[in-house]
């Protein structure tokens, strides 16, 4: 009886596998050999963006992988990226479904992972107008300046004691409070349901949910769900997500309190939701839309900005020549007597901006851009890419391509001195924020947050390794940014 049940469970997989083995009528991209049924799924965790550079060297800039029964095309050249993100932008404008993403972004009721359609268009328009417009960015300046000034005061205490500082926690807390004040109108230092110093832990928990691999993402129907159930994947995902969801629900509850005086994008969506309920609009905001927006602001806004800031500091510690050059520019240009950095100060600095660009080249916020999914059959570099194929654009590999960049793995901001190449989505060799319809709507704000954090750190303090024995690790390592720094008053 048990053998018969096993046969019934495996029969659909066998039939699909036999179908996959049929000769294809398409000219598909080359790729590594696939195992029966699972395809290249066993290689998924080992294919770090750095390793995907080797994939491109072996199979070219357009490579085909098979994750279970999900075809995935990896893109790693600027020409192929332009075909995906510009020429075929509309055809590649949707997103694939994944359980971790579905949980984190409330059944894709957000901007980043929502499938292409009317809901996504409305949510994106709202974010651009109510959160990322020039007028809104100007109104947020005082928050950014206040929080950076507070961070400087706290770091000064470490400098006075000449004790090492956990800069990772300090930067995540700084960015977390800026993002929560701008996006939610909530000051974490005055919050009764969350401690500001726990931001880094919550961001890591949210990122763990997003990265969670479940079999139902790659195998159809009940089979994948059954494996997830018996393997404990579902339970682990739900446990991690419950912590994140509790925070998002508390944020929403704050906005639903009667008599609350605030005018954030969440408040606007609540007002629109009430209006749509009264007017009977066909396209309605739900609680999931509200929490999806809250999640977008938190996950994309905090982790990416804090990570880039820490990578910038790590690279400057690795490269003392660049550290001295950029600090000399900052302190010569701004003078020695500033008590507080203002956003206008950024416009006076040239080499400093190149340091930020070089950091983004080597350490993009998302090494593989958020996956796209083809909505119809297209061609990329002469290869057929059928509908419902996932597309991963490896901006990490393109940023380190020796054909595009001299001494590609070297941190050298001088490479941009006489270059017009920028990261705003038009130069496809350098697209850390993506390009086309799905370009990150928070690119401008995110860049300002990184620049303001770095400028304050470099103007007010001198930096070194917290422990001398870390020198070899920080110079040779590449996996992680440095968390602990020695900080001294300038």
Curated annotation (Swiss-Prot):
Catalytic activity: 2-(L-cystein-S-yl)-2-(1H-indol-3-yl)-acetonitrile + 2 reduced [NADPH--hemoprotein reductase] + 2 O2 = camalexin + hydrogen cyanide + 2 oxidized [NADPH--hemoprotein reductase] + CO2 + 4 H2O + 2 H(+); 2-(L-cystein-S-yl)-2-(1H-indol-3-yl)-acetonitrile + reduced [NADPH--hemoprotein reductase] + O2 = (R)-dihydrocamalexate + hydrogen cyanide + oxidized [NADPH--hemoprotein reductase] + 2 H2O + 2 H(+); (R)-dihydrocamalexate + reduced [NADPH--hemoprotein reductase] + O2 = camalexin + oxidized [NADPH--hemoprotein reductase] + CO2 + 2 H2O
Protein's membrane topology: Single-pass membrane protein
UniProt keyword annotations, A-Z: Membrane, NADP, Oxidoreductase, Plant defense, Transmembrane, Transmembrane helix
Keyword Transmembrane: yes
Cellular localisation: Membrane
Recorded superkingdom: Eukaryota
An annotated Gene Ontology molecular function: monooxygenase activity
GO cellular component, one term: membrane
Enzyme Commission (EC) number: 1.14.19.52
Gene disruption: observed consequences: No visible phenotype under normal growth conditions, but deficient in the phytoalexin camalexin accumulation upon bacterial infection and markedly increased susceptibility to infection by the necrotrophic fungus Alternaria brassicicola.
GO BP annotation list: camalexin biosynthetic process; defense response; defense response to fungus; indole phytoalexin biosynthetic process; regulation of systemic acquired resistance; response to abscisic acid; response to bacterium; response to insect
Description of what induces expression: By salicylic acid, flagellin, oligogalacturonides, silver nitrate, UV-C and infection with A.alternata and various strains of P.syringae. Activated by the transcription factor WRKY33 upon infection with P.syringae.
Keyword 4Fe-4S tagged: no
Transmembrane intervals: 1-21
Family classification: Belongs to the cytochrome P450 family.
Physiological role: Multifunctional enzyme involved in the biosynthesis of the indole-derived phytoalexin camalexin. Catalyzes two reactions, the formation of dihydrocamalexate from indole-3-acetonitrile-cysteine conjugate and the oxidative decarboxylation of dihydrocamalexate which is the final step in camalexin biosynthesis. Required for the resistance to the fungal pathogens A.brassicicola, B.cinerea, B.elliptica, B.tulipae, L.maculans and Colletotrichum higginsianum. Seems not to be required for resistance to P.syringae, P.porri, and not involved in age-related resistance.
Name of the protein described by the UniProt record: Bifunctional dihydrocamalexate synthase/camalexin synthase
Species annotation: Arabidopsis thaliana
């Amino acid at each position: 009886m048990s053998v018969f049940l096993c046969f019934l469970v495996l029969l659909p997989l066998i039939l699909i596998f036999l179908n996959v083995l049929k000769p294809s009528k398409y000219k598909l991209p080359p790729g590594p050999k696939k195992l029966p049924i699972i395809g290249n799924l066993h290689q998924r965790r080992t294919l770090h963006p750095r390793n995907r550079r080797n994939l491109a060297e072996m199979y070219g800039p357009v490579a085909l992988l098979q994750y279970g029964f999900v075809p995935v095309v990896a893109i790693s050249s600027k020409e192929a990226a332009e075909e995906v993100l510009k020429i075929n932008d509309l055809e590649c404008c949707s997103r694939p479904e994944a359980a971790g993403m579905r949980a984190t972004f409330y059944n894709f009721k957000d901007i980043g992972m929502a499938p292409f359609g009317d809901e996504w268009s409305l949510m994106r328009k709202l974010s651009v107008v109510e959160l990322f417009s020039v007028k809104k960015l100007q109104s947020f300046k005082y928050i950014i300046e206040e929080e950076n000034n507070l961070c400087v005061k706290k770091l000064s205490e470490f400098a006075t004691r000449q004790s090492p500082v956990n800069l990772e926690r300090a930067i995540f807390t700084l960015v977390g409070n800026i993002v929560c004040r701008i996006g939610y109108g909530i000051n974490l230092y005055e919050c009764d349901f969350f401690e500001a110093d726990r931001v880094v832990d919550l961001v890591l928990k949210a990122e763990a949910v997003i990265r969670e691999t479940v079999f139902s993402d790659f195998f159809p129907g009940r089979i994948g769900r059954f494996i997830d159930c018996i393997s404990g994947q579902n339970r682990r995902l739900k446990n991690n997500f419950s912590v994140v969801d509790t925070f998002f629900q508390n944020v929403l509850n704050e906005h639903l309190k009667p008599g609350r005086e605030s005018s954030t994008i969440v408040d606007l969506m609540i007002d629109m939701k009430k209006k749509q309920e009264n007017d009977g609009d066909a396209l309605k905001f739900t609680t999931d839309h509200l929490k999806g927006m809250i999640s977008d602001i938190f996950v994309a806004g905090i982790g990416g900005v804090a990570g880039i800031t820490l990578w910038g500091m790590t690279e400057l510690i690795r490269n003392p020549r660049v550290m001295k050059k950029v600090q000399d520019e900052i302190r010569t240009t701004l003078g020695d007597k500033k008590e507080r950095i203002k956003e206008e100060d950024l416009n006076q600095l040239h080499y400093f901006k190149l340091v930020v660009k070089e950091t983004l080249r080597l350490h993009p916020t998302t090494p593989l851009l958020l996956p796209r999914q083809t909505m119809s059959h297209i061609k990329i570099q002469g290869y057929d890419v059928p509908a419902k194929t996932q597309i991963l654009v490896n901006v990490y590999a393109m940023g380190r391509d020796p054909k595009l960049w001299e001494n590609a793995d070297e941190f050298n901001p001088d490479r941009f001195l006489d270059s017009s190449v920028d990261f705003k989505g038009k130069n496809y060799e350098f697209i850390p924020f993506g390009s086309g319809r799905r370009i990150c709507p928070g690119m401008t704000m995110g860049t300002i947050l990184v620049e303001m954090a770095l400028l304050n750190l470099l103007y007010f303090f001198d930096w070194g390794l917290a422990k001398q024995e870390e020198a070899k690790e920080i110079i040779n390592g590449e996996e992680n940014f440095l968390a602990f720094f020695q900080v001294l008053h300038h």
